[in-house]
Amino acid sequence: LIAMGAQIEGAGTSVITVEGVEELSPATHSIVPDRIEAGTLLIAGAITGGHVTVEHCVPEHLQSLVEKMRDAGFRIDTGDDSITVHATETWRGVDIATAPYPGFPTDLQAQFMALMTQARGTSVVTEHIFENRFMHVQELVRLGADITPMTQVAVVRGRRNNLDAAPVMATDLRASASLVLAGLVAGGETEVSRIYHLDRGYEHLEEKLAGLGADIERVAV
């Protein structure tokens, strides 16, 4: 907007002041990459023990996720506009607590919980942003995950290869992503229903995962 001639002060602060102008002029602007989609793809690479590079992202925007993945034992390389996660045979459980940016994103909490189901040891996930943000827990448990949910806290007892295929139902956008990620490592064929939730935040996620080698397809019912 400023590039178009708007009079705006306070960008990056808690108070923004806007002074009206007669008209705005055309301008070219690059949209900020979706850090949540980028983070989901990084977790997909990690949970499957893969080697994945996400390009055209802003590593600074995912610093909290990168730090937690490194704490868990993953090797993460960052470039100017890319992040690479390297495979590891085992990783350890780490605790996360969601917080406003630059803290750990609530919109990656469910996906990270799926990752922690495969970790060595116990993880504690604390949700500070939204109520009722653990609706995916019941479906992960249906797949075999060992998770104890409480009001704002969920305790995840991880163990590799502990998930088995089952029909599961997406309850919201990020929950659907976590179930897809869990399905990638569950033994057998996992069916995730109500994936219209997924489409609200991801563009052809199944095609991107298939391009990385996942055995996944969208089925019309």
Task: Go through the PLM ranges and name each one.
Residues L1-V221:
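Short, structured segments at the rim of ligand-binding sites
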